Amino acid sequence: MTGAVCPGSFDPVTLGHVDVFERAAAQFDEVVVAILVNPAKKGMFDLDERIAMIEESTAHLPNLRVEAGQGLVVDFVKAQGMNAIVKGLRTGTDFEYELQMAQMNKHIAGVDTFFVATAPRYSFVSSSLAKEVAMLGGDVSELLPEPVNRRLRERTK
């Protein structure tokens, strides 16, 4: 059985993230979406809300589960009994940053990283941008899963 971890803060999860999850779920027997908590950062949505939003948005993926973690991604990956990370790439800048992280993860723990090119229709989408546009009254419904869009609209009223 092969498994992979899709790590991130997912504050909130976007359709771009879900696209990466779906593609990972098609390639691996098991996918764990790891919501990594940084205690120094205050997100718009708390951990329980993020877990619920991802679970609702990925209910159609039976081989995917959502877990919370903190610390090094590779420690989380190993604790899950896995040795692969899947990351979505939107731009060349993403690649430069993620390549360094992938090389470090391989060096310190033998964990491989698989990159998935984001679907072009989501290449500009980020959680931060979606939140900013929503807070200014813009429509981000085409960028977010419906359960997320609903919660974001409620939060930014």
From Swiss-Prot:
The record marks 17 as: Transition state stabilizer. Its EC number is 2.7.7.3. Its cofactor is Mg(2+). It is found in: Cytoplasm. InterPro entries: Cyt_trans-like (IPR004821), PPAT (IPR001980), Rossmann-like_a/b/a_fold (IPR014729). Keywords: ATP-binding, Coenzyme A biosynthesis, Cytoplasm, Magnesium, Nucleotide-binding, Nucleotidyltransferase, Transferase. One of its GO terms (cellular component) is cytoplasm. Pfam families: CTP_transf_like. Gene3D superfamilies: HUPs (3.40.50.620). Substrate binds at residues 9, 41, 73, 87. CDD domains: PPAT. Homohexamer. NCBIfam families: coaD_prev_kdtB, cyt_tran_rel. Reversibly transfers an adenylyl group from ATP to 4'-phosphopantetheine, yielding dephospho-CoA (dPCoA) and pyrophosphate. Belongs to the bacterial CoaD family. This is Phosphopantetheine adenylyltransferase.
